[in-house]
């Protein structure tokens, strides 16, 4: 029979050796800790602001002039400098002050790419060490408080399955530090798929104030076939799958304000032969693409002299035309597709 001693050792003894047997119900006084966060009493309308250098901080006025109804702006200010967890920051207090004067909160973005590190292995090197996580978190909080920032938006996109547990622990630790300092905390995520479950949306939702689903990149640069960046079905599935793990009041779906112009040409026999036995061989056309903003995309369609028509499957306006020895295809993001 399996037994345990009073000081916690577990083992087995023969049943016929037991004496003075009595049954007792053991209860635990353990109470699961409750994590309180920051919840806004309004709908979050957030825009990421890609800021690559300190000079670009001065463009906030121009950026806001072309927007409306925003509540939150998220400049890409924080990057991991090295595998020791040091921080590169281009945070700007004047930027924050201008945003506040425009009735906007500033949630600075912390990224694991486009900085000193730029690979899954390097991200793992940082997150797999408690001391390096702590170093990074302390520097992020200090920089945020110095600039008067209102929140942190975590955008780590180079997480491997091996790094999953360490990443989630980092989310826990950063969340606690943010809340201790009055900072809102949100986390960006890919559309949930079976291959990225290690991002652990359910555990994120315990600690993060908001969980953001990046509802785009259905087809990306390097895809084997042309397609929409964010078709209706893709976005809908992403939201519904996220809601299985995240409370609806914490979920934010991010939409693209860009699309891709695709160019297809038939593969030659030589190209098909070279790809034999690979996934690429299943696709008869060679495909390249260029990312375009909404206005530039509509301009390209007009310049081609074609009329886009509504595609019910993707719920987007679609156009294609032949030129330059191949076929151009584009699924537009416009006011109709965003409704």
Question: What is the role of each PLM region?
Answer:
Residues 3, 154, 253:
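Terminal peptide-recognition signature
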Residues 39-54, 64-67, 79-232:
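Chitinase-like catalytic core of GlcNAc-active glycosidases
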Residues 57-58, 191-220, 258-290:
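Substrate-binding cleft/loops of secretory-pathway carbohydrate-active enzymes
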Residues 1-16:
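SH3/SH3-like beta-barrel superfamily modules
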Residues 15-61:
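Boundary/entry segment of secreted carbohydrate-active catalytic domains
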Residues 85-104, 224-252, 256, 291-317:
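Glycoside hydrolase catalytic-domain groove-lining segments
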Residues 28-31, 259-338:
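Glycan-binding loop/region signatures in secreted carbohydrate-active enzymes
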